[in-house]
């Protein structure tokens, strides 16, 4: 039996190899295969947002002014969600709603679905970009894993939550004041601040901020002095290969402060990764629960006692009354097509207000 040994030769003009060589070439701005998703989607998402906040009204969907052209500023302009009557339509420009009419498409809220979907794929493309670059330079993929947390929050809030409700209308509009209103909506209709997943998210974000502040200050405090410059930046050579701070000194300091301290840098930095990422993941999971209208903590015994005893009140019962007020105002304003009329006896009342 004869075995022929030889080098397998591919066609030098293979289209995939040509594209791979060009996309992954070392240049000032890396493109990569992920860039085929990232750059177009980011361009269209940002372009749609700037177009909407500059020119497009929300009169036909929310009865609001939402563009610079109508007198809004950076904090009050927004790309608003489609009307509730349009449910979960993708609102394609060539779809049955707009029928290819760009002006009508903007009036119906088509820019919101355009920005939301391109924004989601743009964020995913950015995560893939980090993964692709990490593979290219033989790094571990923890940057991409960390970036999955804000992606999870974006997808859960802007896509999964409204999919669980009656339409895109109940997603946040893309604007600063619009996001604030959405937060108030979440509180009034879902009692979000008393949701354990929100609590884990807050603990993760604020805990991460605390860890960053402590870590940065500790590193600055324990820097090795290897120059006589006036400050940190002048006293050190930015290309030095040696260790720049003393982990041993930092460990001794925090051992005395707290009684415990991180013993090595790997565990320390993994913890700084774990806290915010887990917090954001948990928060995203909580929003998925809200899409299904799962409730937060209910302390019914306190509500019953507060209803029976005008002298009994807790911060919880006060907040419940505030939530009722938010619902009474927002439901009538946000859903005028429902013709919601609240009689006096169902409006918030009691010794809390």
From Swiss-Prot:
Main subcellular localisation: plastid
Residues annotated to bind a plastoquinone: 215, 262
Membrane-topology annotation of the record: Multi-pass membrane protein
EC number(s) per entry: 1.10.3.9
Binding site for pheophytin a: 130, 143
Enzymatic class: oxidoreductase
Compartments in which it is found: Plastid, Chloroplast thylakoid membrane
Note on cofactor: The D1/D2 heterodimer binds P680, chlorophylls that are the primary electron donor of PSII, and subsequent electron acceptors. It shares a non-heme iron and each subunit binds pheophytin, quinone, additional chlorophylls, carotenoids and lipids. There is also a Cl(-1) ion associated with D1 and D2, which is required for oxygen evolution. The PSII complex binds additional chlorophylls, carotenoids and specific lipids.
GO biological process: photosynthetic electron transport in photosystem II
Cytoplasm found in the keyword field: no
GO molecular function: chlorophyll binding; electron transporter, transferring electrons within the cyclic electron transport pathway of photosynthesis activity; iron ion binding; oxygen evolving activity
UniProt-annotated binding residues for chlorophyll a PD2: 198
Residues given in the record as chlorophyll a ChlzD2 binding sites: 118
Binding site for Fe cation: 215, 269
Phosphothreonine modified-residue sites: 2
Cellular component aspect of the GO annotation: chloroplast thylakoid membrane; photosystem II
Pfam families per UniProt: Photo_RC (PF00124)
Spans traversing the lipid bilayer: 41-61, 125-141, 153-166, 208-228, 279-295
Keywords: Acetylation, Chlorophyll, Chloroplast, Chromophore, Electron transport, Iron, Magnesium, Membrane, Metal-binding, Oxidoreductase, Phosphoprotein, Photosynthesis, Photosystem II, Plastid, Thylakoid, Transmembrane, Transmembrane helix, Transport
Catalysed conversion reaction: 2 a plastoquinone + 4 hnu + 2 H2O = 2 a plastoquinol + O2
Assembly description: PSII is composed of 1 copy each of membrane proteins PsbA, PsbB, PsbC, PsbD, PsbE, PsbF, PsbH, PsbI, PsbJ, PsbK, PsbL, PsbM, PsbT, PsbX, PsbY, PsbZ, Psb30/Ycf12, at least 3 peripheral proteins of the oxygen-evolving complex and a large number of cofactors. It forms dimeric complexes.
Miscellaneous comment in the UniProt entry for this protein: 2 of the reaction center chlorophylls (ChlD1 and ChlD2) are entirely coordinated by water.
Designated name of the protein: Photosystem II D2 protein
Organism: Coffea arabica (Arabian coffee)
Underlying gene: psbD
């Amino acid at each position: 039996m004869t075995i022929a040994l030889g080098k397998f030769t591919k066609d030098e003009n293979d289209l995939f190899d040509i594209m791979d060589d060009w996309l992954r070439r070392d240049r000032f701005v890396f493109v990569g295969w992920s860039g085929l998703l990232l750059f177009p989607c980011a361009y269209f998402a940002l372009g749609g947002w700037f177009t909407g906040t500059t020119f497009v009204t929300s009169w036909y969907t929310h009865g609001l002014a939402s563009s610079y052209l109508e007198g809004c500023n950076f904090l009050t302009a927004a790309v608003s969600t489609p009307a509730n009557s349009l449910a979960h339509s993708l609102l394609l420009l060539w779809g049955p709603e707009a029928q290819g009419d760009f002006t009508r498409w903007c009036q119906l809220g088509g820019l919101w679905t355009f920005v939301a979907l391109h924004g989601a794929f743009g964020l995913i493309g950015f995560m893939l970009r980090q993964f692709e670059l990490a593979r290219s330079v033989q790094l571990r993929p923890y940057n991409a894993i960390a970036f999955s947390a804000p992606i999870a929050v974006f997808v859960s809030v802007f896509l999964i939550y409204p999919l669980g409700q009656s339409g895109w209308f109940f997603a946040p509009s893309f604007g600063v004041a619009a996001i604030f209103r959405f937060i108030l909506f979440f509180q009034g209709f879902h009692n979000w601040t008393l949701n354990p997943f929100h609590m884990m998210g807050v603990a993760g974000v604020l805990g991460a901020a605390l860890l960053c502040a402590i870590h940065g200050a500790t590193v600055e405090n324990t820097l090795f002095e290897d120059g006589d410059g006036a400050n940190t930046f002048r006293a050190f050579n930015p290309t030095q290969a040696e260790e720049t701070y003393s982990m041993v000194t930092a460990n001794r300091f925090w051992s005395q402060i707290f009684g415990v301290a991180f013993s090595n840098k790997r565990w320390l930095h993994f913890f700084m990764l774990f806290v915010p990422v887990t917090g954001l993941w948990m928060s995203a999971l909580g929003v998925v629960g809200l899409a299904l209208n799962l409730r937060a903590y209910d302390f019914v015994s306190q509500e019953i006692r507060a209803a029976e005893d005008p002298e009994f009140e807790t911060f919880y019962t006060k907040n419940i009354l505030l939530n009722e007020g938010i619902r009474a105002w927002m439901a009538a304003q946000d859903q005028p097509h429902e013709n919601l009329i609240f009689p006096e006896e169902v409006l918030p009342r009691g010794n809390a207000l």
